[in-house]
Amino acid sequence: MVRKNILLVEDNEVNRRLAGFLLRSQGYQVREATTALEAFEMLKNDHPDLIVMDIQLPGMDGLEVSRKLKEQPATADIPVIAVTSYAMKGDREKALAAGCAGYVTKPIDKTTFIQEVAAHVGNKSKTED
């Protein structure tokens, strides 16, 4: 099986470490960025199978990043999962309207998170084995 490559964009170190650990525990190859600018720089040389991105990033928020990714032919096909601590009514719809393929709330529920990721990279998660 080919290891799927995921770009994790999260500015909070604790959340980044947790999400990175969960992804790596499922066999995914993970690259990490802490800002939108850093993510865009990485995407110049890398084409991940999935982007898992915090909505509240410094500088440019995750929804704006998702919109910009969908506008660029080189990145338009990369699914984005939005991760947010805000779960207000309509937030999921805003994320999907911005081009996100999925939406996960914090605190991250391991099973939900892994299933959402697996649904967008085409891998069966280890929790389903």
Regions found by a protein language model. Name each.
Residues 54, 84:
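Active-site residues of response regulator receiver
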Residues 108-117:
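C-terminal output helix
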Residues 101:
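Short, glycine/charged-rich "phosphate-handling" switch motifs in NTP-dependent
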Residues 10:
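Conserved acidic carboxylate
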Residues 17-25:
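Charged docking surfaces used in two-component/phosphorelay signaling
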Residues 32-50:
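Acidic, metal-coordinating helix/loop segments flanking the phosphotransfer/catalytic sites
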Residues 16, 58, 76, 88, ...:
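The feature encodes the CheY-like receiver
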